Amino acid sequence: MTTAVGTPGSAITQRVHSLNRPNMVSVGTIIWLSSELMFFAGLFAMYFVARAQAHGNWPPEPTELNLALAVPVTAVLIASSFTCQMGVFAAERGDVFGLRRWYTITLLMGTFFVLGQGYEYYHLAHEGTTIAGSSYGSVFYITTGFHGLHVIGGLIAFVYLLVRTTLSKFTPAQATAAIVVSYYWHFVDIVWIGLFATIYFVS
């Protein structure tokens, strides 16, 4: 009679193998993100149409975008993609402590981005740039606002995942959830790079 004795190393290997195989959750997430991509494509189209129909300066006075704020805030959001991916690598190894550490850092960086965007909104509104004041104000707040809501959605997902992995035993299902959240976060970051380049650099 033989007895199979599992080792932590073999368990982790099996876990990683199962995570690397396609599953319905990951495929469904990718399909959903494709629809989100179409949504943001519509927002980009709206922005360019408004700009093409505008007369005079773009953005119009008194709007002055704070590039000195937008650059570091954007850099932090881009860097958060790397910390998020480090969390994914930890999840694939079965390292729940590493996952929590990297996802907590990502959560803080994403929060910094949202606060930075809110700070810019406050100053633009104080200067007279409002959503109803001009076509520029409308497309600026709508495009960046919807993106900001998506970022907040990602932050909620990070909080949920951190709480879930803290209150219960770490499982392959939780690792898959961490990977799915990373797909969403990378998507949000890529969209912002496009928005940032369009709004702040394309004249």
Task: Write out the residue ranges for each language-model feature.
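...captures the hydrophobic TM-helix bundle architecture rather than a specific catalytic motif
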Residues: M1-S203
